[in-house]
Amino acid sequence: NKINSYTAKLLALIKDIFTGYEDDDSIEKLIANKLTSNNLTISFAESFTGGKISDSLVSVAGASSFFKGSIVCYSTTSKVNNLGIKMDLIDKYSVVSKEVVESMALNVKKMFNSDYSLATTGNAGPTKGDSNKEIGTVYIGVATPEKVFSFEFNFGNSRERVTGKSVNKSFELLLKEL
């Protein structure tokens, strides 16, 4: 009982930074519950995460009630041709930038007519690709009914680590916004 008491006290102290203590409280399920209970929908535009965010969320039963769809626009050409990102924007700021990820979030939200959207762009490595940003640099953008915003992170130089941490951080940012 002492362990349970200490656990409850600790969880109360760190509730803003800790999710998923119980099996039923995965961050994906918490997001799904918030979307469902508020009758909200979501869509994703994923670049270097390659659909991992979408895959994780649709693993929750009932996803069809809140998940409108996603697009994996890995290449610069795909971002321009399929998601409608302006080449001028990419030329001015780089494909890995705040401006591009926010445009991705807005465009996918419009494409799927969702209430919320989330987008990712970044350099997972091992090379920089079409960007001048350092390997490990990622941008995560969120569009809500009222605004769009983004965050920049650097998750190191391991490709698996960069994509994994980006998926987790995406869910964390989304949960806080909902």
Model-predicted segments: where are they?
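Short alpha-helical segments enriched in small residues
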Residues: 2-178
